[in-house]
């Protein structure tokens, strides 16, 4: 399975990339920086550098990639709106950044009473 991992050089994302590869899938990494926190652990996988909030860039990547799945490990709701318009160009979408339901944060740290982000 060809999988785009958004935030694939961060803590959650790089573990997803490694597990996908271990299970025989073909992960590609979409990241803001070429040298992320855990970049060396996933340096052997294809990388695309860019910001997932850049609608034109994200759209181009998704249309060109024709991914079986997109796994998003970065907590921000805007790409969900972008990707929902592109749903014919990929198989499944999984958002797995738990703080994303609370963005933008009104206070730090956020607790269980913090309001949720706008639903899409």
Give names to the regions the model predicted.
Residues 68-72, 94:
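N-terminal Rossmann-like NAD(P) cofactor-binding module of classical short-chain dehydrogenase/reductase
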Residues 9-11, 52-53, 74-79:
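Short beta->alpha connector loops
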Residues 49-68, 78:
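Conserved Rossmann-fold cofactor-binding substructure of NAD(P)-dependent oxidoreductases
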Residues 30-38, 51-52:
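N-terminal Rossmann-fold cofactor-binding loop
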Residues 82-120:
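Conserved Rossmann-fold NAD(P)-dependent oxidoreductase catalytic core, especially the SDR/UDP-sugar
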Residues 2, 26-28, 91-92:
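Residues at the starts of beta-strands that form the adenosine-phosphate
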Residues 35-44, 86:
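Short loop/helix-cap segments at secondary-structure boundaries that form the rim of catalytic
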Residues 3-25:
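N-terminal Rossmann NAD(P)H-binding glycine-rich loop of SDR-like oxidoreductase domains
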């Amino acid at each position: 399975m060809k999988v785009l991992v958004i935030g694939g050089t961060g803590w959650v994302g790089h573990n997803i990339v490694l597990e996908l590869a271990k299970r025989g899938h073909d992960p590609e990494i979409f990241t803001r920086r070429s040298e992320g926190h855990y970049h060396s652990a996933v340096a052997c996988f294809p990388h695309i550098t860019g910001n997932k909030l850049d609608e034109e860039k994200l759209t181009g990547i998704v249309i060109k990639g024709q991914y079986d799945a997109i796994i998003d490990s970065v907590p921000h709701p805007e790409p969900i709106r972008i990707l929902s318009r592109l749903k014919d160009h990929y198989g499944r979408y999984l958002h797995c950044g738990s703080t994303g339901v609370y963005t933008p944060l009104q206070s730090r740290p956020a607790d269980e009473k913090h309001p949720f982000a706008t639903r899409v």
